[in-house]
């Protein structure tokens, strides 16, 4: 939705897109990731600082929390669209629990705002992506995340300290590295105990060879 616009999409534009997707899915759950700009995903119309290493800078949820009006607009559209299906919302690039708490507070504000405006809405379930090692190694800190989704591309990049946009170190960004597999295995074990849902996205999610590992 964001990446295919020449500028920032309006609340109505986002609402229509989300609603169309949810109505198509019917009763099936639909997970929508909030704005994940920055790094390898620059976004026209959004002010982003020049950074020497954007993969470690202001991207994902970090950027959304610095642009609260943009984030609020998306959350309003998501809450309105949630009336039309089974919506889950996940936030990317989470490092510390305070970021998730701030998101939840903003979501509550948006719900209160929509109530005051007498606009129909439903508060979606809120989860997070696990791609930053600090979050991957300490999932017990995120007790209020309804679910986790492992962002394997970034997790591999950060665990191997190998930028995935540089071909001369691409061979080091190995998803089969024992450290990567260990972190994912420990996340699975944590979620088995905590009851939190866990899914896998990114390139590893399309490779059946990793299922047995």
List PLM regions with ranges.
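Conserved alpha/beta-domain cores
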Residues: 1-213
């Amino acid at each position: 939705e964001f990446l295919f616009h020449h500028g920032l999409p309006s609340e109505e534009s986002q609402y229509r897109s989300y609603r169309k997707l949810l109505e198509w899915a019917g009763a099936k759950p639909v997970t929508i990731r909030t704005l994940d700009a920055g790094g390898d995903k620059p976004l026209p119309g959004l002010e982003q600082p020049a950074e020497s290493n954007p993969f470690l800078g202001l991207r994902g949820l970090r950027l959304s929390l610095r642009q609260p009006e943009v984030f609020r607009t998306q959350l309003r559209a998501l809450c309105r669209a949630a009336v039309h299906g089974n919506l889950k919302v996940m936030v990317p690039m989470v490092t510390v629990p305070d970021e998730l708490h701030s998101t939840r507070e903003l979501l509550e504000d948006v719900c209160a705002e929509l109530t005051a405006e007498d606009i129909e809405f439903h508060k979606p379930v809120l989860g997070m992506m696990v791609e930053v090692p600090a979050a991957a190694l300490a999932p017990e800190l995120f007790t209020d995340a309804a679910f986790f989704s492992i962002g394997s591309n970034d997790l591999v990049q950060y665990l191997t300290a190998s930028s995935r946009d540089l071909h001369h170190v691409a061979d080091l960004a190995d998803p089969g590295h024992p450290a990567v597999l260990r972190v994912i295995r420990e996340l699975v074990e944590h979620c088995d105990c905590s009851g939190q849902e866990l899914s896998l996205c990114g390139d590893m999610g399309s490779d059946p060879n990793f299922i047995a590992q």
